[in-house]
A protein has these predicted regions:
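A structural signal for multi-pass alpha-helical bundles of membrane permease subunits
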Residues: 1-196
Length: 196
């Protein structure tokens, strides 16, 4: 049990740059994944230079790197559910599905909302993994908003500071809106009110 917690949480302890470098090593043209494909007499795949694959792997690496943190939040929520509630459901002969949908998920909802909002905020702010894995390419396949701000304001020959500042402001407003939504959902759930 402790081993699996460690396995899930370990990537959170690593720097996003280190995580991206490990995955870049695995996914590069001469990397481990292609070596396995070649050993099975398959054609190697350009994981990071094909737009579709690069987009998928960028998202996967970002999610994988933070999954342990989200799992920890959900595990804390599960452990906070009183055992008496499950015992009462067992005495009432509630099916496992009914126990899940009527007890576990409703009591876990505040934690699920926090995880959802944190994951959305992290998804919007992803930069390190993209910068190390693909640099925003191929083309603009993995250019997310923070990468766009960086490229527009600092990396290009012509620095478009106004456009980068406008994109930064839009990002800040979006993140504030997500945070306010999370607060509203959490407070409405705690008060037992219906969210409008």
């Amino acid at each position: 049990r402790g081993f699996w917690r460690g396995v899930f949480f370990y990537p959170v302890l690593l720097s996003p740059v280190v995580v991206a470098l490990i995955w870049k090593w695995l996914l590069q043209s001469q990397g481990v994944f292609n070596a396995v494909l070649v050993s099975m007499h398959q054609t190697p795949v350009e994981w990071l230079t094909d737009g579709r694959w690069a987009f998928f792997w960028t998202i996967f690496v970002s999610i994988w790197a933070h999954m342990g943190f989200y799992t920890l939040i959900l595990l804390a929520g599960l452990q906070a559910i009183p055992k008496d509630v499950y015992e009462a459901a067992l005495m009432d002969k509630a099916s496992p599905w009914r126990t899940l949908t009527r007890i576990t998920l409703p009591l876990l909802m505040p934690n699920l909302i926090v995880v959802l909002v944190l994951a959305m905020i992290r998804a919007v702010q992803v930069f390190d993994e993209v910068f190390v894995l693909t640099g925003g390419g191929p083309g603009s396949a993995t250019t997310f908003i923070v990468q766009f701000i960086y490229q527009t304001g600092f990396a290009e020959q012509i620095h478009l500071y106004g456009l980068a500042a406008a994109a930064s402001l839009a990002l800040a407003v979006g993140l504030i809106a997500l945070t306010l939504l999370q607060l509203k959902l959490t407070h409405a759930k705690e008060a037992g009110q219906k969210v409008r």
